[in-house]
Amino acid sequence: MSDDVQERLKGLVETHDVLLFMKGSPLFPQCGFSSRAVAILNHLRVDFESFDVLQDQGVRQGIKAFSDWPTIPQLYVKGEFVGGSDIMMEMYESGELAQMLADKGVVAAH
């Protein structure tokens, strides 16, 4: 991954409180995993930004090295990598995701 891509990714994850790197957009996800990630965030009423990795091959490959995680989608909260779709689902089902988002001041505690 080039330094330019690394700096761009760092800037993106630090600029947005909640950022989802995904395939497609929240309105038109291009894979089931991205769709599930969006559904989880929407259900928790999280205000989030998304980045469509299908529109930028450098970011699509770079984000995998940046996070040391091989798949998309990838969720970042307050600059910290949380995980992909499966981890999001596990955390959502256990209540851990809602608690983490509340602890970081992103959503109100339920």
Language-model features, listed with the residues they occupy:
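Short, conserved clusters of charged catalytic residues that mark active-site
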Residues: 4, 58, 83
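Non-catalytic, surface beta->alpha helical segment in thiol-disulfide oxidoreductase systems
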Residues: 77-108
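TIR-domain catalytic/interaction hotspot
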Residues: 7, 60-65
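Thiol-based oxidoreductase modules, predominantly thioredoxin-like and allied folds used
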Residues: 45-60
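Local sequence-structure signature of Cys/Sec-based thiol-disulfide redox active-site neighborhoods
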Residues: 10-47
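Thiol/disulfide oxidoreductase modules built on the thioredoxin-like
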Residues: 65-71
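Flexible, polar/low-complexity N-terminal or interdomain linker segments that lie immediately upstream
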Residues: 1-10
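Acidic beta-strand-to-loop metal/phosphate-binding motif
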Residues: 21, 74-78
